[in-house]
A protein has these predicted regions:
Chain A
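Multi-bladed beta-propeller domains
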Residues: 155-172, 198-216, 242-257, 285-302, ...
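A structural "domain/chain start" motif
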Residues: 22-62
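Bacterial N-terminal signal peptides
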Residues: 8-17
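Amphipathic beta-strand/beta-sheet edge segments enriched in Tyr/Trp
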Residues: 76-122
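A flexible loop/linker signature enriched in serine peptidases of the S9 family
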Residues: 131, 142-150, 168, 186-195, ...
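Hydrophobic beta-strand positions that form the internal "hydrophobic ladder"
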Residues: 138, 183, 224-228, 267-271, ...
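Residue-level detector of Asp-centered blade-edge/turn motifs that repeat once per structural unit
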Residues: 132-134, 178-179, 222-223, 265-266, ...
Length: 394, 191
């Protein structure tokens, strides 16, 4: 009760002060409104697409849909995209309202598919001023029904996939080394859950964590210099940080049920799932060591598998409450999380608005994309088996 | 009078604010420092955990080497698998008899070691389950230590939800899958 008064009085004063200030200026009563979602509800940008063959049209539509565009007739489009794809791709974008051509360009390159992706990146940049994601890559795991699997990489839309491992063992949690063509992942190849570093160019790999217990869930710092992981060598699974080659591992937490570390884009914090005071929560700890701080997720219990957007603004995570739902909240805690779509294990694209995640269907996983502002979702091109644990290269 | 018009809505706003935030949570949203009683400070690996981290294939902890060159005997302790409640790594009393049997097997042959494999049902996310399986294996190791087994003879690993014994999608299957399997390890004989 004493605590109540400690808040009530200052709040009352503050509210009263605001009321007085406002009362000076307008005659209206103060409205009580429900808090608006911090993500808002952005309407997709309407564009038209004409002149390309069906495969190129499909690629343009896929790329643009998951970045918040929708497709209408030329007469009602805000931007008109036209061109051709005989031989190579030629594309042109006209701003219908402004009555001007944003660009007109021809592309050459290995395949029509690559050219089409280059075109959509130019379209996104010309219209939004932001870099597009059509030429980015993902890593994920493909799992067979016996539990064994392999690590794969692919274009962000699931095409041009290739297996990175051929070990016929259990693998999980691929994570890109930023700025390098390399992956970290967990593999049971040596009879224990270990973390490997795998150079994709040379094919060489080292295990960088082979301690007793389970070495799982690698997450690489944004500058590529350090790797966070969950290790249980000390007797309970905790968050550890080591240099990129695995040297000098340091235990960062003593909380009891840690999993899924991820880094803030400034490299200062590691966010992870844990259990504090009997409640499952998200938390963050300074990457150099320090106090663990809870990140509250009001309205979304049992948060897990967080991922911090590259622009620093958002944390996406999985809520486990019977089903699994992808949620997004402001990283500064200034608004509660928003529940977006059924699914698990989100990973942010470099554009900080498209998420890739896994959703369960018929006993296996498929990978899907979500634009968090327009809420548009689309499955990517699926590979055989169960595809899950996606990681978007940044 | 402008002030009179405002008092009623202000009281309402105050009431709503209090109801929404509750009186207990008077810290700013998002930041609650946790006193890290066991030491939030950064800790190095304990002595004996030296690794050649800078060498290719480095990072092998001494303990792991002690478990190499052993053969796995899955049959010996197959009947003593212990099971867990949903989302829990707590050892239930119903499992005491099985743990005692495992402890007896280990004490009857001091040359043996033990591998505990922790598993989960499918109702968790993948990395959460991988950590939960590990906690289940560690809990059994702790329980065996209380029964007199030297924990240095035991290593743990987690399969998360990757190795269910029952592929079904109901509680009957799930309860079978939430388990620790015990694998007896014998030193390899011969030259």
């Amino acid at each position: 009760m004493k605590n109540c008064l400690n808040i009530c009085l200052p709040v009352l004063f503050a509210v009263f002060a605001v009321a007085l200030a406002r009362g000076q200026n307008d005659q209206n009563e103060i409205q009580i409104t429900r808090p608006v979602s911090s993500l808002g509800n952005t309407r997709p940008i309407p564009v038209s697409i004409e002149g390309f063959d069906s495969e190129v049209t499909a690629i343009l539509k896929f790329d643009l849909y998951v970045q918040g565009f929708t497709f209408v007739s030329p007469e009602t489009a805000q931007y008109q995209i036209s061109g051709s794809s005989t031989g190579s791709v030629v594309g042109r974008v006209v701003d219908r309202f402004g009555k001007k051509t944003l660009f007109s360009r021809s592309y050459n390159g290995a395949t029509l598919r690559r050219q089409a992706h280059a075109l959509t990146d130019d379209i996104v940049f010309a219209i939004t001023g932001k870099k597009g994601i059509a030429q980015t890559q993902i890593a994920f795991k493909v799992q067979a029904s016996n539990g064994n699997g392999e690590i794969y990489i692919a274009d962000f839309d699931g095409h041009n996939y290739q297996a990175v491992t051929h070990d016929g063992t259990i693998v999980s949690a691929p994570a890109w080394a930023p700025g390098r063509s390399a992956l970290y992942y967990n593999s049971y190849k040596r009879g224990n859950p270990d973390i490997f570093y795998h150079n994709l160019t040379t094919g060489e790999r080292d295990d960088i964590a082979h301690y007793t217990g389970s070495n799982i869930s690698p997450a690489v710092s944004p500058d590529g210099s350090r790797v966070a992981m969950v290790m249980s060598e000390s007797g309970s699974p905790n968050v550890w940080v080591a240099n990129a080659n695995g040297s000098h591992p340091r235990k960062l937490t003593s909380t009891s049920e840690d999993s899924s570390p991820c880094w803030s884009p400034d490299g200062q914090w590691i966010c992870f799932a844990t259990k504090i005071h009997e409640r499952r929560v998200l938390a963050k700890v300074p990457a150099g060591g320090g106090e663990v701080q809870v990140i509250r997720t009001p309205g979304t219990p049992n948060p897990t598998e967080p991922d911090w957007s590259p622009d620093g603004k958002w944390i996406a995570f999985t809520m486990q409450a019977g089903e699994f739902d992808i949620c997004v909240m402001p990283a500064d805690g200034s608004a509660p999380p928003v529940i977006l779509v059924r699914g698990e294990d989100p990973s942010w694209s470099p554009n900080s608005r498209t998420l890739i995640y896994a959703r369960r269907t018929g006993g296996h996983y498929v990978l899907s994309l979500l634009d968090v502002y327009t809420k548009q979702v689309k499955d990517i091109h699926q590979i055989l088996g169960s595809d899950s644990e996606p990681a978007w290269a940044r | 009078m402008k002030m009179m018009k405002l008092v009623y809505p202000m009281t309402l706003v105050l009431a709503v604010t209090l109801a929404a935030t509750g009186c207990r949570n008077h810290k700013p949203v998002g930041v609650t420092p946790i006193p890290n009683g066991q030491g939030g400070q950064v800790g190095e690996l304990p002595p004996g955990g030296t690794m050649g981290g800078n060498q290719p294939g480095g990072g092998q902890q001494a303990n792991m080497q002690e478990f190499e060159n052993m053969t796995e005997d899955r049959a010996a302790l197959a009947n003593y698998t212990i099971h867990f409640a949903f989302d829990s790594s707590a050892i239930r009393h119903s499992e005491d008899a099985n743990l005692q049997s495992v402890a007896s097997a280990l004490s009857s042959d001091p040359s043996t070691k033990l591998l505990i494999e922790g598993n989960c049902d499918e109702r968790g996310t993948e990395e959460y389950n991988r950590a939960l399986g590990e906690r289940r294996a560690l809990a059994a190791r702790q329980a065996l230590a209380k029964l007199g087994v030297d924990p240095a003879r035991i290593r743990t690993l987690s399969y998360g939800k990757d190795k269910p014994t029952d592929p079904g999608h109901d509680e009957s299957a799930w309860s079978q899958n939430r388990r620790d399997d015990f694998v007896l390890l014998h030193p390899k004989t011969g030259a």
